[in-house]
Amino acid sequence: MGISCCRATGTFVTQKLAAVALMATLTLGSLNFGLMSQASAQTLTDGSKPVLTVGLSSMNELKNDVNYVTGLIGRPEFGGFFGVAAMAYSQGVDQDEPIGVLVSMGSGAPEPIVILPTANVKQILSRLEAQFQEMEEEEDGTIAIGVNGMTIYVQQKGKVAVAAQSKDALALVPKDPKPLYADLAEKHNLGVRLQIQQIPAPIRDAFLGAMRQGFTQTMQAGGDPGAADTAAAALDQIEQLIKDSDQLTFGLGIDAEAGALVIDTSYTAVAGSVTAAMQQGQRPIPSRFSAVIRDDAAAYVHQAVSISPESIEQAQEGVDANLDMIRNALSQPGALPPGLGDEALGYIEQVAELAMDSIKEGKSDSGFLVLAGEDKLQFVMGLFVSDGGKVEALAKDLATKIPDDPRAPRLTFDLETYNGVTLHKLELDVPEREDEARKLFGETLEAYIGTADKAVYASFGKGSEALLKEFIDSGASDAGEIRPNAQMQVTMMPFLELANSIEADDVISNVITTVGQSAGKGKIRMVMESIENGSKVSFTVGAGVIQAIGAAIPTPGAGAAPF
């Protein structure tokens, strides 16, 4: 019987596996952001777990979500094109079941396995038979297909078909493989899970050895001992991270019900490892600066989290290595004018010492807020420090270095003390030619700095003094509400209104109308939370943002957009 898989299908599978490998590599490069999904209890038949697992949502769900997004951007015909193409290439596939890809390394080399939801794979292959190089059905029902000079083996296992480059790989797939990947496709259109500890230790060690060898050769060629020490410390941390890492997960999904594009990531370390201790030491704490979290914010960033002893130690090593590199750079002939290098280094060392003293307090607490709108831009921030008095002393010392120039900023220290915070004022004349800046800030830009025993504040913009005092007052009212470790939110509408008030634009006006009709006014949100031995990060892009992109794209035949 001559049944085979088309070359296009073989190439498609190969390209998909390559894309998955690239995604896993990119995810590994951003380990600090991590992902939430728990590892499935399901294993392969040899008791191991796949090194890499990919779950793709059902074709029906994928088509519905693509239709939703293309409708948001005002191009529903694109969703129709996708649906037609998907139907042409997925005939015979169960449209309501997810697709899975597993990569095992039981043999010491990657073995990709594709799992397709179909009850009759022979029917699918028969339709594509003419595009195969060769095909043979073996006595046990396995179908061997010649594709681009290699053989792919396909087996029917219940309601799914399994394809791999060896029969041994097919034997690794359990009778019901769906639990291996279904959780990844349940909440996302695409889910990826990387089990780092399933990579054989010799392969991990070989990778680390090659990385260290390449580093050594690069440093020998560079000849900068300061940079070498810094890079060596960073390399040690990367090596520790790779050895301690357990699981990475990535999920990309379209949530039509919530009206958002969702990206979830998570990272976990091996229980009992140094990295796990660092992750476990990060827990939400009461915050002095939580008032930045407000509904009318154009943007805010907030973090309030404990810092583990292991993280403090690692931070100290990093600061020391960077200071050594800076000292070496400033000591080079001609780096700075005579005497200036020592002075600059003195200030840098003071800042580094203050930063480390703050970290050694075992917590990080900060908040940043931007308010914007028509002819309006304000900013306020607060930051925990170990000694606000040292910050004030450093600022006063630096102020003596400001040149005697009428265009230079004017500083007024010890303006007043408000609720335990000493306020200082900075004024800067806005040149007459800067019409847009004067429209926002007036003839003089005013900024305020506040220093307290354990905090530093800053604000600028019209009305920034009142905004700063309001922010200071709010710090005493935090009731220790449990919040995420860190969170960020950006809302498009206030920035669009600001841009349009500075210089009116038809395209911006059109986007404003579109975003104004959306529920979230164009929000982008990020939340970071702790999980056992790790952390998870969720990004949400609201429907208003997607609609804004569509509104900014010129309609075919209408000409290019003004920007």
Segment roles from a protein language model:
Residues 1-15:
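N-terminal secretory signal peptides that target proteins for export/translocation
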Residues 25, 480-481, 485-563:
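In a subset of proteins, long, contiguous C-terminal domains/tails are tracked
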Residues 39-148, 183-247, 266-375, 399-413, ...:
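Structural boundary/hinge residues at secondary-structure and domain interfaces
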Residues 50-54, 99, 112-116, 143, ...:
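One face of beta-strands
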Residues 88-96, 108, 118-157, 193, ...:
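Short Gly/Thr-rich strand-loop-strand
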Residues 100, 349-374, 388-389, 405-412, ...:
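Long compositionally biased, domain-poor regions of proteins
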Residues 144-218, 441-519:
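A conserved glycine-rich beta-strand in the N-terminal activation segment of trypsin-fold
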